[in-house]
Amino acid sequence: MPATVHNLGLRPSLLSAVLAEIRDRELQQDRMRFRRNLERCGEIFAYEISKVLPYVERDVQTSLGAARVPVLAEQPVIASILRAGLPLHQGLLNYFDHADNSFISAYRKHEGDADHFEVEIEYLSSPSVEGRTVILCDPMLATG
């Protein structure tokens, strides 16, 4: 599957209300609410992402008989840049609850000029991502 970008901000949705709270200076002071709103964003993202993933048909036995239903062809790998991405990661996991996880610890290493830096990776824990859908959850929030 090629890399794709879906701009969820093109149309008003529940995401708009959640982002309004995240950007609100007063509400930002409530750390628990801020983290929960990031988690809500992850849940909304997961739902939207699920619409473009590949599915296969599977038979399930219901109380009324057999039914053919679409299920994900393969679970994604949810990758997070530690720490800021953790609430967003959890929101995605709330929906992709059988997904594999990948965690990366990285920081900007500045040398000399403040405008130039290298990304230093200190830690990486990940399953093989070869041929897999990887969802990178890194909020990189700019709330000003």
Language model feature labels by segment:
Residues 1-144:
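PRPP-associated nucleotide enzymes
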